Amino acid sequence: QPAPDAMVLDCGCGGGANIKTLLKLCPNGKVQGIDYSAVSVEKTRKINARAIAAGRCTVQQASVAELPFEAEQFDVVTAFETVYFWPELAQNFREVYRVLKPGGVFFICNEANGETTKDDKWTQIIDGMTIYTDTALKKYLEKAGFCQIQSHKNKKGWLCVTAQKL
């Protein structure tokens, strides 16, 4: 769980629900969100309008390939259900590493874990989707410089991975 005053970046913020939750977890912190989709950015801004007005949240259209932030700015970076669509995972993870503060944590959460037959169905119907196993994610994270990489799977197959920048 992030510290109450954490600076958090949510990559691929989608409809903004995770940002809303992160704002509650970090009542004295700030949460920034990016998404490649203009529609998602607008939805996220709508659902988090109060936090934006209070200066606790910003949301912008951007790509994880070139994060529009200074180096070492965030305590936590999250990616919920989004790394499936990142075009260059190794380079994208290096960008996340760049914007994390030393000691910062990257948190990835995916409904699909790359180890079930249902995962094949998704990649067949959704163009450009790649489902990664925990082993594959760990290799990419290590190449980007992350350490203390841990993965957890629940009974429903959700995969959560944490990685730290030292």
Predicted ranges, named:
Residues 4, 100-105:
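Short glycine-dipeptide loop
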Residues 105-162:
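C-terminal alpha-helical "lid/dimerization" subdomain adjacent to the S-adenosyl-L-methionine
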Residues 7-66:
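Class I SAM-dependent methyltransferase SAM/SAH-binding core
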Residues 76-89:
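A short SAM/SAH-binding and catalytic strip from SAM-dependent methyltransferases
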Residues 65-77:
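A short acidic, Gly/Pro-enriched loop at the edge of an enzyme's catalytic core
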Residues 90-102:
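A short glycine-rich, Lys/Arg-flanked "PGG" loop and its adjoining helix->strand segment in the class I
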Residues 1-7:
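Short helix-loop-beta connector
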